[in-house]
Regions:
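Short intracellular "coupling" helices and adjacent cytoplasmic loop segments at the cytosolic face
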Residues: 16-21, 121, 129-153, 157-159, ...
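An intracellular "coupling" helix at the cytosolic face of ABC transporter transmembrane type-1 domains
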Residues: 140-141, 159-166, 170, 174, ...
Length: 610
């Protein structure tokens, strides 16, 4: 899609927010995530069952292998003593049983991996779907107070991180927990003294894990934050690349990028350093336990209180006992990132939505288009009022022009009329009904808009025009294009109406974009028309043609025209002259010129050289 403004289709105040905060409420966020995943209850239960089964079969394996070792050892001893030697049939039977267990374990592990991948991808899909639907229910003020990068980060970085970490961590938690419990039971069965020797290393392991996690958490937090900042900066620079070039700001932009990229690098390598240090340290501690068990096992074997095969099994269990503890520690680190991403997603999904009238909403089908502003007051924040006690009565079919300097409140009036924002005081009525009594969607269906910043999406010219009326016929589409004086240039394009407009809409000129948006508005056939600098981006000849088409379109419709080029609104029925949120003058073109006031000064300043 192409939208040439960063903060919303009609501008407004904006500020950036630093994304990527660490989860403020780890427990609460994980509870929300578990509740969110309830819809996948059945496959998750299957994952748990298959993961436990796979792990249990693996746990039993060393014991069976130990039995084979014991059998071979006893056979060798008997052979030396003049006995029958090794019972190969029994050993073969044991090994076949072991092979069957490992094959079954691998199959169960493969199945649970497939199911978990399906679950994690479904969670990501559902979250993106929920976020996409949520976006369309959010008030305009949300997007005008945040950068594109922050909002996009929720849909891309956070959801991707969440899906990947779920896929890795969920099965790891199940298998590691099962393995710790199962291996502990098997070690107890073999030898309590050797088990105690292993357990003595646990406090050291836990202490190291706690130390590493406490050191790494701030860096993981900073990494997510700087990644969000970097994404926002890249998007911002790319969308404004022409401006950067025009003002020779390449070096400045590169330095800013290097600064943020450097912060990301520093936080990333530190977080990965601490995370990577966990495995070697845990292996070191595990080796200490391994040595202790070897010495103690040799002593017990000499005392003939334990078999050689049992020592071998126990040594394997020592390895299998320390490994899942390390894995759980790594999962703990991963869950910090998971929780941070999940919290940001849930924060967005829980954001306040536009208030919609659900019951007894007034229908818009019979409305004619009389618009009344009654003592309207509004400000984007409590400290600054933009519209002050604004009142005007617009009759059906009138062409109303709104003029004034930048910041006078012209575009804000349109936002209020379409309920992108609600008034702080007073009311706006259409045919005597407060617009807050309509459904927002019904109210906005009454309007056709042509904005100063064109919005086209990556599709054919035909589909972009049809956006104004999705069920329009080919004849209607071409009729709208002709009325907007766009048909000729469309026919000269490769493919005509089938030509694809690229993602940035830079394969057609700015004036051609404007013509297509006007054609789209004509096709929509609205009751109320809004033109916000509709001809400001085209040349004089095109402007004249568009103006004639607009005059035909506005015939019989209530129309609001916002323009700085006063030549386009001389024939308006009413001209509202705004300054600092107030109507300072009101009347038609001749009346306002005769007054010699603010409008006359604006007009004369534009045409003094004519």
């Amino acid at each position: 899609m192409s939208n040439n403004r960063r903060r919303g289709p009609m501008g407004g105040p904006g500020r950036g927010m630093a994304p990527g905060e660490k989860a403020k409420d780890l427990k609460g966020t994980m509870v929300k995530l578990i509740k969110y995943m309830r819809r996948f209850y059945v496959p998750i239960v299957m994952v748990i069952i298959f993961a436990i089964a796979s792990t249990v079969f693996n746990i039993v394996g060393p014991t069976i292998l130990g039995d084979a070792t014991t059998e071979i050892f006893k056979g060798l001893v008997h052979k030396v003593s003049g006995g029958s030697g090794i019972d190969f049939d029994k050993v073969t039977h044991i090994l076949l049983m072991l092979l069957s267990l490992y094959v079954a374990s691998a199959i169960f592990s493969f199945i649970q991996g497939l199911i978990m991948t399906h679950v994690s991808n479904n969670v990501s899909y559902q979250m993106r779907k929920d976020i996409s639907e949520k976006i369309h229910r959010m008030p305009m003020k949300y997007f005008e107070s945040r950068t594109y990068g922050e909002v996009l980060s929720r849909v891309t970085n956070d959801v991707d991180t969440l899906g990947q970490s779920l896929n890795q961590s969920m099965t790891q938690i199940i298998t590691s927990t099962t393995q710790i419990v199962g291996v502990f039971i098997m070690m107890i069965r073999i030898s309590i003294p050797m088990t105690i020797a292993v357990l003595l290393t646990l406090p050291l392991s836990m202490g190291l894990i706690g130390l590493i996690m406490s050191k790494s958490q701030p860096y993981f937090k900073a990494q997510q934050k700087h990644l969000g900042e970097l994404n926002g900066q890249v998007e911002e620079i790319y969308s404004g690349h022409n401006i950067v070039k025009a003002f020779n700001k390449e070096e400045s932009v590169i330095e800013e990028f290097k600064e943020v990229n450097g912060k990301l690098y520093n936080s990333a390598w530190r977080s990965q350093f601490f995370s990577g240090a966990m495995m070697p340290l845990m292996q070191f501690v595990g080796n200490l336990g391994y040595v202790a068990v070897t010495i103690l096992g040799g002593y017990l074997a000499i005392k003939k209180t334990i078999e050689v095969g049992q020592i071998q099994s126990f040594l394997q269990y020592v390895r299998n006992f320390s490994q899942p503890i390390t894995q759980l520690a790594q999962v703990g680190n991963m869950m910090q990132t998971t929780a941070a991403s999940a919290e940001r997603v849930f924060e967005f999904l829980e954001e306040e939505e536009e208030i919609e009238v659900e019951k007894d909403a007034v229908p818009v089908d019979t409305l004619a288009g009389n618009v009344t502003f009654e003592h309207v007051n509004f400000g984007y924040n409590k400290d600054q009022t933009i519209i002050n006690d604004f009142s005007v009565d617009v009759k059906e079919g009138q062409k109303v022009a709104i003029v004034g300097p930048t910041g006078a409140g012209k575009t804000t009036l349109i936002k209020l009329l379409m309920r992108f924002y609600d008034v702080n005081g007073g009311c706006i009525k259409v045919d005597g009904q407060d617009i807050r009594e309509f459904k927002r969607s019904d109210l906005r269906e009454m309007f056709g808009m042509v904005l100063q910043d064109t919005w086209l999406y990556n599709a054919s010219i035909r589909d972009n025009i049809r956006y104004g009326k999705l069920d329009a016929s080919e004849e209607e589409i071409q009729g709208a294009a002709r009325a907007a004086y766009a048909h000729h240039f469309i026919e000269t394009q490769p493919g005509g109406y089938d030509m694809e407009i690229n993602e940035e809409s830079n394969n057609i000129s700015q004036g051609q974009k404007q013509l297509l948006t006007i054609a789209r508005a004509i096709l929509a056939d609205p009751k109320i028309l809004i033109l916000d600098e509709a001809t400001s981006s085209v040349d004089t000849r095109t402007e004249e043609r568009i103006q004639m088409a607009m005059d035909n379109l506005m015939q019989g419709r209530t129309s609001f025209v916002i323009a700085h080029r006063l030549s386009t609104i001389k024939d308006a029925d009413v001209i509202l002259v705004m300054n600092h949120g107030d109507i300072v003058e009101q009347g038609n073109h001749e009346e306002l010129l005769a007054k010699g006031g603010f409008y006359a000064d604006l007009y004369n300043s534009q045409f003094e050289n004519a």
